[in-house]
């Protein structure tokens, strides 16, 4: 019904505006999976240009701009489709995935942000540089729970679209592939092994993490404050 949403928009927004115009569609929502560290988002400028609502998952952080702080499981109508927010803390505390459900009620795609990559999961040591009482161990434990309680129970045919691929500093073992089925990730992603205990997951996730770039915390604060 000529309604569109943008997930995690880049800083340069004109391509989104042009594509929406080309397809005679109105950008209704800007869904952010988390407060990004590796780039400055175009969410504020895109909202000003289109009137779209900026949406984040549950967070205690107060944004410097108007945004809808959604609850876990909250749904948004987009034409005949439904977008359901799934709160998946771990990479950051507000990290959320967006589940796309078609007009027949079938779950079609999961936009996972930095929670689940192809071949990897998000590093759990970034938010601790912004929120003092967080540790990478606590975040890794949250991520384990999010993966096992929120994502892995979803059906295997679901298409996973992460925010990054190989080369990003937000993970350590990302594939060059940009999408995959959830079922294949359950079989091949080291972090989703059923035999992996929470303690083993935390240890394995933290091994080999290099220090994040120094500008990451600055980007987070810019994305929160506007």
Where are these regions (language model features)?
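Active-site neighborhood of phospho(di)ester-bond hydrolases with catalytic His/Asp-centered motifs
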Residues: 6-7, 27-36, 55-58, 87-90, ...
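Accessory terminal helices/loops
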Residues: 129-226
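Short acidic-hydrophobic, aromatic-tinged amphipathic segments that line or gate anion-handling sites
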Residues: 68-72
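Active-site metal-binding motif and surrounding structural segment of the metallo-beta-lactamase
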Residues: 11-55
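Conserved beta-strand hairpin/beta-sheet module of binuclear metal-dependent hydrolase folds
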Residues: 1-26, 98-113, 118-119
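Core dinuclear metal-dependent hydrolase active-site scaffold
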Residues: 75-105, 109-110
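Active-site environment of divalent metal-dependent phosphoester hydrolases
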Residues: 13-14, 35-40, 61-64, 93-94, ...
